[in-house]
């Protein structure tokens, strides 16, 4: 973390998400209570810490299961939502089995594409509502949807219909707050 806030990763290929395990450190220590010798004390304890970890996690599968549980838990999801607006946005969506949902939309045609028929327009409305000032362009948003849907155990699917992209996404009633 930096300044007791989680670091923000914008990498969209999934490499960070597959490896990232989030630990929160939000108990801020005042300057008067900070131990100036803490780094040296921790360095002296590293061999003991390693022995303890090896003893507690002699079975690597148990350690792996605990890390996966933490990585995929509610607290980790909340942090992912705070750091990635596309992941936050996906909580307001339903993912269908087939690409028979909203059209992707985008471009400059605001008459043809509205928040009722365009996933990208819904995303832009969400970004404005959430006070997020840097929305992704249509292509980057579409790429970001696949890993964001996976965070919720869903799959993002698209298909081409008459030269347009149709998604497997519909909005939930929770979207009414920003539509």
Specify the residue positions occupied by each region the protein language model found.
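Feature primarily recognizes SF3-like P-loop helicase cores of small DNA viruses
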Residues: 1-179
């Amino acid at each position: 973390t930096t300044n007791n806030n989680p670091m923000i990763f914008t990498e969209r290929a999934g490499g960070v998400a597959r490896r990232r395990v989030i630990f929160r450190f939000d108990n801020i220590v005042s300057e008067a209570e900070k131990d100036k010798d803490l780094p040296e004390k921790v360095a002296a304890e590293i061999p003991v810490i390693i022995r303890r970890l090896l003893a507690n996690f002699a079975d690597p599968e148990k350690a792996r299961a605990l890390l996966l549980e933490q990585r995929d838990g509610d607290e980790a999801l909340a942090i992912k939502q705070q750091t990635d607006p596309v992941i936050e946005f996906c909580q307001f969506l339903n993912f269908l089995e087939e690409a028979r949902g909203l059209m992707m939309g985008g471009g400059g045609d605001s008459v043809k594409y509205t928040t009722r028929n365009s996933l990208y327009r819904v995303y832009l409305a969400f970004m404005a509502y959430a006070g997020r000032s840097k929305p992704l362009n249509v292509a980057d948003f579409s790429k970001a949807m696949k890993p964001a849907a996976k965070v919720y155990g869903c799959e993002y699917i698209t298909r081409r219909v008459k030269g347009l992209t149709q998604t497997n996404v519909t909005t939930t009633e929770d979207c009414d707050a920003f539509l």
